[in-house]
């Protein structure tokens, strides 16, 4: 399955949600699965982004649906990047 990097920045509402219910992060990951994608790994980060997630989805349409659904909630802003395995990238050159 294609791999995507999902970079997340919490809004003030999202910060309050995570502070009051840290387990909400795992709940959202399960919701991502219900939308057809899988969170394979996830980190909390310092700096511009609050979270970096490695997500697998069957196609860009599914990933777009995930990004739109999560973004529409107003608790975080998302930047999603398709990731090409380095061997595939080298072979394409």
Label the model's feature ranges.
Residues 5-9, 43-66:
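Short, well-ordered beta-strand segments in beta-rich or mixed alpha/beta enzyme
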Residues 1-34, 38, 45-49, 84, ...:
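Short S/T/G/P-rich N-terminal loop/turn motif that feeds into the first structured element of a domain
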Residues 57-84:
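An amphipathic, aromatic/His-enriched active-site/gating alpha helix that lines ligand/cofactor pockets
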Residues 39-42, 78-80:
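Generic structural signal for residues in well-ordered beta-strands
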